[in-house]
Regions:
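Residues in the short beta-alpha loop(s) of Rossmann-like NAD(P)-binding domains
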Residues: 9, 34-36, 139, 220, ...
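C-terminal helical cap/extension that packs against the catalytic core
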Residues: 43-49, 332-395
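Short, basic phosphate-binding NTP loop
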Residues: 1-8, 12-108, 129, 275, ...
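Nucleotide phosphate-binding/pyrophosphate-handling subdomain across enzymes
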Residues: 20, 24, 246-342
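Glycine/aspartate-rich loop-and-adjacent alpha/beta segment that forms the canonical ThDP
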Residues: 400-427
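Residue-level signal for inorganic ion chemistry
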Residues: 21, 69, 109, 138, ...
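Phosphate-binding loop of NTP-binding sites
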Residues: 61-66, 73-233, 380, 417-427
Length: 427
């Protein structure tokens, strides 16, 4: 099959799509309007695997050549080149066509805010209660990554899909309304100051209405009921479904609590499962707390400026920073503030580290150790810098500011490597 990846994506979402089809022996081309340099080094890896890369514009011949076009959600459905495509999908519509979908209870999470927290908390709680659960969508996990797991026999009981409102609408239009009937649809919040509640509900897209359970804010419940008609069996407000939530839990847990309650779990089960939720994986995730140190996984920091936002959270504490990785097209100067303030720096190996970070550190006479090929070596070095006699809380922080693909494939694998390395320290 000839597969065209239409739009590589600002966070290289096309990488997972391309790899999925390359691993199956398909012919793959990638087309993007950006220059080759701005796309990063992931495309070099894909090219070595057999993909053909066309940058700085699109060619009609690529669309005529293709049997299947995988469209980036950022590309409008009325794009002129799509008229030449035989078949068009995005990652979610392609996944929905798989027969395994009928074996999985899907929970869709959308809204203007709290999507990532709600999705991650639901995934954690369901797994904690013994129900195998995966998640994909907006948090950076492509549905093609999920399909790879299915191909290997790892089919979950539940799948959490985090969707932006425009992705939900895009997927609905792609499928011409024939979307799968999901177990639950969660609308976490609505846009501020909509003209009417009907408008707010409409913005969330009809994809959300084909569900056994719809859980939404009380302010749009009536509008959602009107829109859903007979498509949903049970529409509940977050507020009404979460009244028994433990007062020890933060208010942001009301959304996942309400969903789990409507799915039939007891209050005691839900409260216990959510109590152990430490935060969104790979985003300032607390991995370990000792008497005088915190180990934080911020592996989703894939651009230099993101490191500053994370380090600023701990500005009053000594931060032992683990950073670096792939993609030499990035400008390391954006994280110079954090490099200067760090109590110590342990570098992870990669093209960004070698070509950008190390020269910047040397230019500014900032000490560092590494680069380390293995995460456990970087974690071990950072931990050795902790002052065991200090009464001040210290932080060992993985915040790479770079792509993980050369050594880890994606930021989630990199985060797992960090967590495993930390767990080895306390054995």
């Amino acid at each position: 099959m000839n597969v065209l990846i239409f739009g590589y994506g600002l966070r290289a979402g096309g990488f997972d799509s391309a790899m999925y089809f390359l691993q199956r022996g398909d012919n793959v081309r990638i087309t993007d309007i950006r220059s080759r340099d701005s796309m990063g080094e992931g495309v070099d890896y894909l090219e070595k695997k057999g993909a053909v890369i066309h940058c700085s514009g699109h060619l009609t011949d690529d669309f005529l050549w293709s049997d299947l076009v995988i469209k980036s959600p950022s590309i409008r459905q009325d794009n002129e080149f799509l008229a030449f495509a035989k078949r068009i999908e995005n990652d979610l519509t392609y996944a929905s066509s798989r027969p395994e979908v009928s074996q999985v209870k899907i929970i869709c999470v959308t809204g203007s805010r709290y999507k990532a927290t709600t999705s991650s908390a639901l995934c954690h709680a369901l797994n904690e209660m013994g129900h195998r659960t995966h998640m994909c969508g907006n948090m950076g996990i492509s549905a093609f990554s999920e399909l790879q797991k299915w191909d290997e026999g790892d089919i979950p009981e539940y799948l959490i899909i985090e969707m932006s409102t425009w992705l939900a609408r895009d997927t609905y239009l792609f499928m011409k309304g024939n979307v799968p009937h999901v177990e639950a649809s969660v609308i976490t919040s609505v846009f501020e100051n909509p003209d009417t509640t009907e408008e707010a509900a409409n913005r969330l897209g009809e994809f959300n209405l084909h569900a056994n359970h719809i859980i939404c804010p009380a302010e749009v419940k009536d509008a959602i009921e009107k829109l859903a008609a007979k498509k949903a069996k049970n529409i509940s407000s977050i507020e009404a479904a979460s009244w028994a939530m433990s007062k020890a839990l933060p208010d942001k847990m009301r959304r996942p609590y309400a969903v789990l309650k409507k799915l039939g779990f007891s209050s005691s089960q839900i409260n216990a499962a959510l109590k152990s939720f430490k935060g969104i994986p790979n985003r300032c995730e607390l991995v370990l707390r000792t008497e005088n140190a915190m180990y934080i996984n911020d592996s989703s920091s894939v651009i230099p400026v993101a490191v500053n936002f994370t380090v600023d959270n701990y500005e009053s504490l000594p931060v032992h920073l683990i950073c670096g990785g792939s993609d030499s097209s990035l400008d390391a100067h954006a994280m110079l503030q954090s490099l200067r303030s760090a109590a110590s720096i342990s570098l992870l190996a990669g093209s960004f580290t070698q070509k950008k970070l190390i020269p910047l550190l040397r230019e500014n006479k900032i000490a560092f150790k590494g680069p380390y090929e293995k995460m456990e070596e970087a974690v071990r070095n950072a931990s050795s810098k902790l002052n065991s006699k200090s009464s001040i809380l210290q932080v060992v922080l993985l915040s790479p500011g770079a792509s993980p693909f050369e050594n880890y494939g994606n930021e989630f694998s990199r985060g797992e490597a960090f967590k495993q390395a930390v767990s080895q320290l306390v054995r």
